[in-house]
Amino acid sequence: MVGSMENPGSWGLACLLISTSRFNRYMPYYTMMAAVWSTLIAGALKLQEDPASLSVEYILFKAGLCFVHCLLLCGAGNTWNDLIDRDIDARVERTKMRPLASGKVSTVEALVWMVGQYFLSVKMLDLILDNRSIWGLMLPLTASIMLYPYLKRPVFSRVFIYPQYILGLAVAYPSITGWASINGQEQSMSEIFTHCTPICLLIFFWCLYFNTAYSHQDSVDDRKMNINSAYVVAGQRIRLFLAFLGALPLAVIPYVVLKINSPWLWFSWMAVWTVSIVMQIVRFDSKKLESGGRIHWDNFLLGLWTTVACIVEVGLQKVEFWNLI
């Protein structure tokens, strides 16, 4: 369906386009977490070395720019996904009323909306990196976003390539942007990549875990249409598979926290994440498809908690709290 079923009016069209970007739902806000966490951790590390080197306001400003950049890029990516998958979405119960799948938004309208969001995200990245070359960061991320919907096709399952791989990469990659927003003038790109590797792996594994649980909601319709997704690896052992995936980010967290070695981060990351993920696996019921959506939501709350924890750590480093006790 590529044409509008009816003219919704300017306000109605705006609401539909916002829905196409998912800005009216919590999902896009996952994509800001890698960049924001990386910005805050990089800022906290710099304050640990020299509390006078940066202001808290500057670090939060950079984190805010990263948030807007990632949100806009995610909106463009979601619009692209719905453009490519509109015929598939029309046959899946959970997605059949999406604006493109239902014909309420035309292909041309969606394309214009997508390009506008992408352009604004590029301009925002230019601000974040203080007019440095941005395409070295932007092009790999753009390629992964464009590739993502095609990996749902069954041909990729034959070589064990699943869309969650690319989604995890796309969500994790902006951690490089976040680190560069603080250290871009002082560190080479190879140094930035090295510093960001632990947090990139953490976000990648985390995304693989919660998105596999989320996509399991559509398993009945997906099997009918032979849609490729990571949960097919597990078969009937989906709980065991999710437990394995949930253990992967927990294994990486120490390498992230050790950079600062803050007691607060050890508690707010390692302890809270461990309890949360264990509880999620215990509550998961493979016979109730909606329980995968509950895991997705629980991890969003976990991500918000981690963002707040990182902001608190920036404040603790600024006042040299750990030197006072």
Swiss-Prot record:
* Pathway, per record: Secondary metabolite biosynthesis; terpenoid biosynthesis
Question: So which residues have sugars stuck on them?
Answer: 131
Q: Name one GO cellular component term.
A: plasma membrane
> Null-mutant phenotype, please?
Results in dramatic reduction in MPA production and leads to the accumulation of DHMP.
What's the Enzyme Commission number for this chain? 2.5.1.-
InterPro entries linked to this entry: Prenyltransferase, UbiA_prenyltransferase, UbiA_prenylTrfase_CS, UbiA_sf
Principal EC category: transferase
Q: Which is a GO BP term held by this UniProt record?
A: mycophenolic acid biosynthetic process
What cofactor requirement does the entry state?
Mg(2+)
PROSITE patterns, A to Z? UBIA
> What is catalyzed by this enzyme?
5,7-dihydroxy-4-methylphthalide + (2E,6E)-farnesyl diphosphate = 4-farnesyl-3,5-dihydroxy-6-methylphthalide + diphosphate
Q: What does this protein do?
A: Polyprenyl transferase; part of the gene cluster that mediates the biosynthesis of mycophenolic acid (MPA), the first isolated antibiotic natural product in the world obtained from a culture of Penicillium brevicompactum in 1893. MpaA is a Golgi apparatus-associated enzyme that catalyzes the prenylation of 5,7-dihydroxy-4,6-dimethylphthalide (DHMP) to yield farnesyl-DHMP (FDHMP). The first step of the pathway is the synthesis of 5-methylorsellinic acid (5MOA) by the cytosolic polyketide synthase mpaC.
Q: Which family does it belong to?
A: Belongs to the UbiA prenyltransferase family.
Protein name (database record): Polyprenyl transferase mpaA
> Which organism is this entry from?
Penicillium roqueforti (strain FM164)
List the gene name: mpaA
